[in-house]
């Protein structure tokens, strides 16, 4: 009987991991704001302020304060994912990488939606941690709200 219970628990754990992966994939699909990458940041964006906002979001991420990351986002970003779901996806990454050291590379770019009507600012930031690196892909709208916060 206990063998059956163990198998059921193993299956439940597997289903939970699959659900987490699907949540992450859905987040990527829904929140991808950069459909058309450009070489230059749109003139309406302040690159310095955009980087400050991205660094603030990464700071919250490093503190595992996922609700604050969500609060920095646009309405769609905030409605799509809960802080608990964010934690399920990101805690293992942070636990594996260890303590944050520094941002080693930042690249900014311009983005447009599929229709080419709305411009966004995109950032790719590479961060060193004790046990590896994390690459952040962050998209910000003209109101300096997060449209996308992806972690690799």
PLM regions: where:
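A short, local hydrophobic-aromatic micro-motif
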Residues: 32, 101-104, 147
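Short solvent-exposed beta->alpha transition segments
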Residues: 67-116
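Short, low-complexity N-terminal intrinsically disordered segments enriched in polar/charged residues
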Residues: 33-63
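Second-shell loop/turn segments in exported
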Residues: 41-44, 55-56, 73-79, 124
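Sec-dependent bacterial lipoprotein signal peptides
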Residues: 1-32
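Exposed beta-sheet edge and beta->alpha loop/turn motif
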Residues: 107-152
